[in-house]
């Protein structure tokens, strides 16, 4: 199948055009339109959360209108223009991430490094999953002074880095890892669960009656809460058995904001010039439950000790329990936050480039990313729009990428797919 499109009444056999569009659009144009729609979805997620906190940017809204319109039937048949739209989507996603970062920092303060517990405290519990910091804060306000303790899950882990959230004593720790462990995790702990955004899964019967959604998230058979009154969630938590006092086997570090890392720039420069730091790598992204994604842990474990790893998004859970130590006080593993905090990794790279007096593309920096869904598509186009090279992507190529699109991505943007950890490390470090 070269393409699939069934958005108009002319569609082949009334079921879908699969070789060429009845309208005349080529398979490559159809796939680039799909790519653009996926990027728009990713931008919309970050833009939505910024607007929840009262922050807006009409330029982003205007682009979303125009870009979506361009995919309408009989509007645009030009493949090159859709590549340009994708790059513009990358630039708009950069603005959306900047807007959301500003919203988070002005609302909750700039993150600072913190160690997060991974065990449980004696008392009642609520697990919060998703990405929505506002929903978390409103819940924390409502459980203050009670024995109902709140645990983050997956992409909510970075919440612990924000001073305005960390101040709440009922924010206890983090349970579980990436989004896909939730069915097992939520069934294991007798707690109420609040799903706040994307990355929720249809629940099993074992915990459906104690799960709630809020904001954009919806699940069949699960109570949805409009607004931020979480009384029902709290009462459900109170009705359940206590969690045991059980310390975790390790702690997780997060909260490395742009300012924190940039404050170390001169020290980092000294270490690079002394040969103690030889390469920086961004390893992270959206994780998937494929055996293939064991690659990322093995990759980091096999890196030489003169490397520093910046991680983010739920892909961090492949590696954030590893003790990589430090290089003269500079941590070798730096967690900068959620997937939208890709902006932090970008700002760190730009700051280091300035310190060294070079372009970002001239830094000893490689990106090794895992992708799962549409937000990752928007982020990839952001990186490409910034002119970044040395990007490795896995676990698989996007299904909508055909040979023509792949040629553009590899020839013009230098995109590579992951192979084997040792082979890629040798290629990256040129050893």
From Swiss-Prot:
Binding site for hybrid [4Fe-2O-2S] cluster: 131, 155, 199, 286, 314, 339, 373, 375
InterPro entries named among the record's database cross-references: HCP/CODH (IPR004137), Hydroxylam_reduct (IPR010048), Prismane-like_a/b-sand (IPR016099), Prismane-like_sf (IPR011254), Prismane_a-bundle (IPR016100)
Cofactor binding notes: Binds 1 [4Fe-4S] cluster.
Catalysed transformations (reactions): A + NH4(+) + H2O = hydroxylamine + AH2 + H(+)
Keywords: 4Fe-4S, Cytoplasm, Iron, Iron-sulfur, Metal-binding, Oxidoreductase
Record EC number: 1.7.99.1
Binding sites annotated in the UniProt record for [4Fe-4S] cluster: 5, 8, 17, 23
Residues bearing PTM Cysteine persulfide: 286
Cofactor: [4Fe-4S] cluster; hybrid [4Fe-2O-2S] cluster
Protein purpose: Catalyzes the reduction of hydroxylamine to form NH(3) and H(2)O.
UniProt protein name: Hydroxylamine reductase
Species of origin: Thermotoga maritima (strain ATCC 43589 / DSM 3109 / JCM 10099 / NBRC 100826 / MSB8)
